[in-house]
């Protein structure tokens, strides 16, 4: 046995000689070595640092540093370099390195906007083998790989991600993101979901969504329902940290409407429009639109039709654009042999009015936008104690709102070309463009995918085409075709030639929307601008913007050139609606669907008959009268529109809701000519 040799240190302690020699050798001959690479941890350093460590490391740890460098390159937005380095990984990797290789490969595919490839990679990963940091990245990747329609897998990923987040702001953001994703699910999505018995958190989220959708029209009922839900699901993260949108609703304070300012042009060409809006506003304020009268008269028939003289479209001059009618057009409600149309929900069931009438004692002040600059009028209104402004009406005035700073809540009666999100401004437009956007949504919902716009060869047609195509592409549609026509004389000439109208248009050119970004593993990457998807196959839907006289010529020519059983659905705007037309016209229009505001579609003939005669006898002014009534309703629910996603009111101009930028969207009733009658499209 070797003898134990010891050395006495200066402190008097004894240590083995071999150990002392080792310590001395370590101190005198220290060699600089690369620290171990934490391949399963967070990669917080720069790509240059990891690349340097990779160059200095041995073969055993080189791949670890290489994987960390790839992640850093992704975070820095250097996708080509990350891709090159990923391709240089050795073929022989440890199990831990292989897991990281697959995870970072999925992250790269997401950054390159290849979600399907990313999903294929992620589906092969065993989550149980991942570290906590890797699991966090995995669920972030699953969420980011669902670009577009929300899926159940994405909702589950949000739920699994929540306990992995360590900072309160991260947990709050994830709860808000979960809630946002849930609110994009359709009734069909919810009905088709299969929930496992152990998914109590998911079940709680879905119950919260249901009670929100059932009670969002009444904050008091919603508050009580949420309190009961928190008792039933105490372990759900939202039970102690509500989504911001829900929390805002529970603390919603309705804005005062004790004093309202109307900003309207009281002189010039637009005065007639202002008068109609003000009349409808005052009628609604005084309760004329709160009678909930039946959609038919006592003998079961709608009210009689009235003549509708033409009105000029002064949108080019900046005023609100209204649908025009030719002098021989008539319109108000459905003909006597048709069913009236009450407001319907998505299932086709009647909807009862869901909002309170507002404050009838509100003080109304009217300001003339044609006599003073808009900033001065807003300043005067503020000094007068006004709490809410309705208007301006003219488009050039509405455009100025982006450059004016005011604390007043504003319901503008038009919409600028480029809408900016202001927390105190909503936009309510009654225009052919607005109607075209609703038509795009309706046609899309009917399963059509290759529409053609048949529009007049003038600025009105251009504006409608742009609005329709923009909305269509926002829904996920491809390019939209447009085909123009000239005067009635030109249309008659085409009839005489016997050629008809062949549906062969040119793509509508629009400026693509700003691309969204993708955030993955801490990196926010702008999405590339994608060109519109080309529409495949033939035209399956035609949206027609024409007067009654024009559509009388157009419809037969479409049938002549394409046949009456061609599978192409025809849609028309309210511009072509001629309620007073006889059975011959209605038979000629067989199958055509068209939209109109509820008040003129027969939802409440009693209210229509109570309107002043000068508006009942003018189709376009009656629309503005209804717009004024809805302006009163919207003003009294301004806070809800701004803060409650999905909040709706049943108005005289449609079912009204607000987009993210508080642009009021109108869902219009759709009607159809069927065997000489007009029936609702359900």
Swiss-Prot record:
The GO cellular component terms are:
periplasmic side of cell outer membrane
The UniProt record lists lipidation (N-palmitoyl cysteine) at 27
**What Gene3D superfamilies does UniProt report for this protein, alphabetically?**
1.25.40.650, 3.40.50.2300, Tetratricopeptide repeat domain
From the Swiss-Prot or TrEMBL record, state where the protein is found.
Cell outer membrane
Attached lipid, kind S-diacylglycerol cysteine, located at 27
Annotated membrane topology is:
Lipid-anchor
Task: Kindly indicate where the leader peptide sits in this chain.
Answer: 1-26
One Gene Ontology BP term is: regulation of cell shape
Similarity field: Belongs to the LpoA family.
Query: Could you describe the subunit structure of this protein?
Result: Interacts with PBP1a.
Q: What does this protein do?
A: Regulator of peptidoglycan synthesis that is essential for the function of penicillin-binding protein 1A (PBP1a).
- Name of the protein in question: Penicillin-binding protein activator LpoA
Phylogenetic classification of the source organism: Bacteria, Pseudomonadati, Pseudomonadota, Gammaproteobacteria, Enterobacterales
């Amino acid at each position: 046995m070797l003898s134990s040799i010891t050395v006495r240190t200066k402190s008097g302690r004894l240590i083995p000689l071999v150990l002392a020699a080792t310590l001395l050798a370590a101190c005198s001959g220290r060699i600089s070595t690369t620290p171990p690479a934490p391949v399963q941890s967070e990669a917080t350093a720069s790509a240059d640092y990891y690349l340097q460590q990779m160059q200095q490391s041995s073969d055993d740890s080189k791949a670890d540093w290489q994987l960390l460098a790839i992640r850093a390159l992704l975070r820095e937005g250097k996708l080509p370099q990350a891709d090159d380095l990923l391709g240089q990984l050795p073929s022989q990797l440890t199990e831990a390195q292989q897991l990281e290789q697959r995870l970072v490969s999925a992250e790269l595919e997401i950054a390159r906007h290849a979600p399907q490839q990313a999903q294929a990679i992620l589906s092969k990963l065993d989550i149980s083998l991942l570290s906590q940091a890797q699991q966090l990245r995995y669920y972030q990747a699953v969420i980011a790989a669902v670009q577009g329609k929300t899926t159940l897998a994405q909702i589950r990923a949000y739920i699994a991600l929540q306990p992995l987040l360590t900072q309160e702001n991260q947990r709050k953001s994830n709860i808000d993101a979960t809630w946002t994703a849930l609110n994009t699910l359709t009734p069909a999505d919810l009905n088709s979901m299969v929930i496992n018995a152990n998914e109590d958190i998911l079940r709680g989220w879905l119950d919260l969504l249901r009670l929100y959708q059932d009670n969002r029209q009444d904050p008091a009922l919603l508050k009580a329902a949420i309190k009961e839900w928190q008792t039933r699901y105490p372990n759900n993260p939202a039970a102690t940290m509500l989504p911001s949108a829900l929390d805002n609703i529970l603390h919603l304070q309705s804005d005062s409407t004790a004093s309202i300012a109307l900003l309207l042009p009281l002189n010039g060409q637009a005065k007639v429009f202002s008068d109609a809006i003000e009349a409808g506003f005052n009628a609604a304020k005084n309760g004329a639109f709160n009678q909930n009268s039946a959609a038919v008269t006592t003998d079961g028939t709608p009210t009689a039709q009235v003549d509708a003289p033409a009105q000029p479209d002064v949108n080019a001059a900046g005023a609100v654009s209204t649908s025009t009618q030719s002098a021989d057009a008539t319109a108000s409600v459905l003909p006597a042999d048709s069913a009236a149309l009450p407001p319907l929900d998505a299932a086709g069931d009647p909807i009862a009015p869901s909002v309170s009438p507002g404050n009838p004692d509100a003080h109304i002040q009217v300001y003339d936008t044609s006599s003073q600059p808009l900033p001065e009028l807003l300043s005067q209104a503020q000094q007068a104690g006004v709490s809410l402004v309705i208007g301006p009406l003219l488009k050039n005035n509405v455009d100025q709102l982006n450059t004016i700073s005011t604390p007043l809540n504003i319901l503008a009666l038009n919409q600028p070309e480029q809408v900016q999100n202001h927390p105190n401004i909503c936009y309510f437009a009654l225009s052919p463009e607005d109607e075209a956007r609703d038509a795009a949504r309706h046609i899309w919902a009917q399963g059509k995918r290759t529409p053609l716009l048949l529009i007049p060869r003038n600025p009105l047609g251009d504006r409608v085409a742009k609005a329709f195509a923009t909305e269509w592409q926002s829904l996920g549609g491809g390019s939209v075709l447009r085909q123009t026509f000239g005067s009635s004389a030109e249309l008659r000439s085409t009839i005489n030639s016997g050629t008809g109208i062949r549906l062969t248009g040119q793509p509508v050119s629009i400026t693509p929307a700003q691309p969204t970004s993708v955030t993955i593993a801490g990196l926010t990457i702008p999405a590339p601008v994608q060109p519109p998807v080309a529409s495949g196959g033939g035209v399956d839907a035609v949206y027609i913007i024409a007067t009654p006289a024009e559509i009388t010529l157009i419809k037969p020519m479409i049938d002549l050139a394409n046949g009456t059983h061609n599978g192409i659905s025809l849609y028309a705007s309210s511009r072509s609606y001629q309620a007073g037309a006889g059975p011959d016209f209605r038979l000629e229009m067989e199958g055509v669907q068209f939209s109109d505001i509820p008040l003129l579609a027969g939802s409440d003939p009693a209210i229509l008959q109570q309107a002043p005669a000068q508006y009942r006898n003018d189709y376009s002014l009656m629309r503005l009268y209804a717009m004024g009534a809805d302006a009163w309703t919207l003003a009294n629910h301004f806070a809800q529109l701004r803060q409650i996603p999905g909040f709706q009111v049943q108005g005289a101009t449609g079912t009204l809701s607000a987009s993210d930028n508080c642009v009021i969207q109108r869902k219009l009733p759709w009607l159809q000519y069927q065997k000489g009658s007009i029936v609702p499209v359900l």
